């Protein structure tokens, strides 16, 4: 028997392909901490965090508009399934997260679809999952888009999440003029 025949079979690893876009990425260096086009192997037991805090986040955005921890991804396995899935949780108190136009408030979470658009502020992430067999590891690979992903992929468009934190709270604010007495501020 040759060593080739004795070698362990290499398991295919699930990979999240994440294409990132921000309109100011070229001039501001927002993504300078992210290694593009390399597959990074991570244990499935790890909760992957995205944000601006370099001490707690795996992937850092150099932008004060981003929360210390913006969102997290965690691996899980559905009952009677042989492949891993991901859940996404909004960790930001100040900004909602949109996943395929479903709004997640602070600490809300949902299963991450196999292909989806994640958005907050001016950030756009196109996420595509490639299934693998490994239950021990998964990979993340980043690429950068120079064009808005919403337009490039004909995604149902909405405006960026406003500064007030969520679409629903901004829509309910009364923007019409109000009469105030001279002793009222």
Swiss-Prot record:
FHA domain boundaries: 48-104
Phylogenetic classification of the source organism: Eukaryota, Metazoa, Chordata, Craniata, Vertebrata
Subunit record text: Homooligomer; homooligomerizes following phosphorylation at Thr-9. Interacts with IRAK1, TRAF2 and TRAF6. Interacts with TIFAB; binding to TIFAB inhibits TRAF6 activation, possibly by inducing a conformational change in TIFA. Interacts with ZCCHC11; binding to ZCCHC11 suppresses the TRAF6-dependent activation of NF-kappa-B.
Subcellular localization: Cytoplasm
Pfam family, one: FHA
Signal peptide start and end residues: none
Similarity section: Belongs to the TIFA family.
Cellular component GO terms, alphabetical: cytoplasm
Swiss-Prot/TrEMBL keywords: Cytoplasm, Immunity, Innate immunity, Phosphoprotein
Protein name: TRAF-interacting protein with FHA domain-containing protein A
Phosphothreonine carried by residues: 9
GO biological process assignments: cytoplasmic pattern recognition receptor signaling pathway; innate immune response; positive regulation of canonical NF-kappaB signal transduction; protein homooligomerization
CDD domains xrefs: FHA_TIFA
Physiological role: Adapter molecule that plays a key role in the activation of pro-inflammatory NF-kappa-B signaling following detection of bacterial pathogen-associated molecular pattern metabolites (PAMPs). Promotes activation of an innate immune response by inducing the oligomerization and polyubiquitination of TRAF6, which leads to the activation of TAK1 and IKK through a proteasome-independent mechanism.
Domain notes: The FHA domain recognizes and binds phosphorylated Thr-9, promoting homooligomerization and subsequent activation of NF-kappa-B.
Gene: TIFA
Record note on modification: Phosphorylated at Thr-9 following detection of ADP-D-glycero-beta-D-manno-heptose (ADP-Heptose) by ALPK1. Phosphorylation at Thr-9 by ALPK1 leads to the formation of an intermolecular binding between the FHA domain and phosphorylated Thr-9, promoting TIFA oligomerization and TIFA-mediated NF-kappa-B activation.
